[in-house]
Amino acid sequence: MDIAKTLQKIAEELGGSFTEYSDNNLILTVPTKDGRFQGITTYILEHDGKKVLEIASRVCDADLPGINYRSLLEMNQELTYSKILIFDGYIQLASEVLAEHVNEVILKDIVDEVGHTADKIEFQLTGKDVH
């Protein structure tokens, strides 16, 4: 499967946009609720000799006052493909999958979950469309 072409098709199907920033950094922007948009970055990496897709979306700064971190951890139980985590100083939604085990349907489900859930949490925590 051509990951870039598949992600471009998914972005178009979701009414969003696609940018191939580099060979291993692909960016989708997808529409969410109430006219907001969410940026999703896919990194194509190699772990232990296997191609891995890391699909992530920033939510907000991890040190934003008033964050209930326990509540965020508990939300992980409700997610199918992604998890809430802190990386590079940001709360993010992220998913990793072996490229050889993913197909277009699953990839679209992952993008949908990451984008919409990140937007939902971002709006709950900040009241804004930040990322």
Where are the regions a protein language model picked out?
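Well-ordered alpha/beta subsegment
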Residues: Y81-D112, H116-H131
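Charged, low-complexity, helix/coiled-coil-prone segments
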Residues: Q8-Y21, D48-G66, K128-D129
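Glycine-rich portal/gate segments that line the openings of hydrophobic small-molecule binding cavities
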Residues: L28-E54
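Short, internal acidic amphipathic alpha-helical interface segments
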Residues: K50-Y90, A94
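Short amphipathic alpha-helical segments
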Residues: D2-T6, L64, N68, I106-E113, ...
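Residues that form generic nucleotide/phosphate-binding pockets
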Residues: T6-E13, S71-M75, Q124
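Charge-rich, low-complexity N-terminal segments
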Residues: M1-F37, I86
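Short, surface-exposed beta-strand-loop junctions and turns on beta-sheet-rich folds
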Residues: D34-G35, D61, A99-H101
